[in-house]
């Protein structure tokens, strides 16, 4: 499949999806939203881990406000028909999804990153819930992710003041996993992603399923889910390999089964 707004690369079990409209800071237009969603579904069948990153100086500046085709659009329709499938493709993906935020992530672009399981940012990157600057409220999942990740007080401040949050501050406040010096950034995220691509895929999928369920489950239901999922993992080839590798004092060779 050919793409016009993104790049898709796969190697050694890792799919790297790059937002590729650097001339507009990788702003999201309809074509990019559709291509991202399609690429994410494709990666589920080809890869063991996924990376989302951006080309040029930005990760993603959010909705393309300069897109002539977007004039007069119905925001509710766009969110329901284009953003929701994209965000669900990230959040519900059984594979680990890593966002490598190379630069500015604003508006829906910030929330696109936050939909990932792990966010690693270059130190020069920044996050901004820019919506109120143009008379809107956070969307693209922002009102769901932000309070859960940083608490209500910080989420409210980020939304109401629409200020830039630097990568190091974002890491300190728990918005992202880590901030990395720019000079080391690509090498670092590729090493992290390779670790995920070589890892126990079924265990990673179970972690995601359990953590997501834990956001709403009462404790008894969560304990029951843990027991069921752990029982399934205990029958896996990767569990047997992990135990054998531990006993033999060698690195495990996981196959994802």
UniProtKB/Swiss-Prot annotation:
PROSITE patterns on file: ENOYL_COA_HYDRATASE (PS00166)
Disulfide bonds: none
Alphabetic keyword roster: Fatty acid metabolism, Lipid metabolism, Lyase
GO molecular function: enoyl-CoA hydratase activity
Function: Could possibly oxidize fatty acids using specific components.
PANTHER family assigned: EG:BACN32G11.4 PROTEIN, ENOYL-COA HYDRATASE
Listed name of the protein: Probable enoyl-CoA hydratase
Organism: Rhodobacter capsulatus (strain ATCC BAA-309 / NBRC 16581 / SB1003)
Gene name linked to the record: fadB1
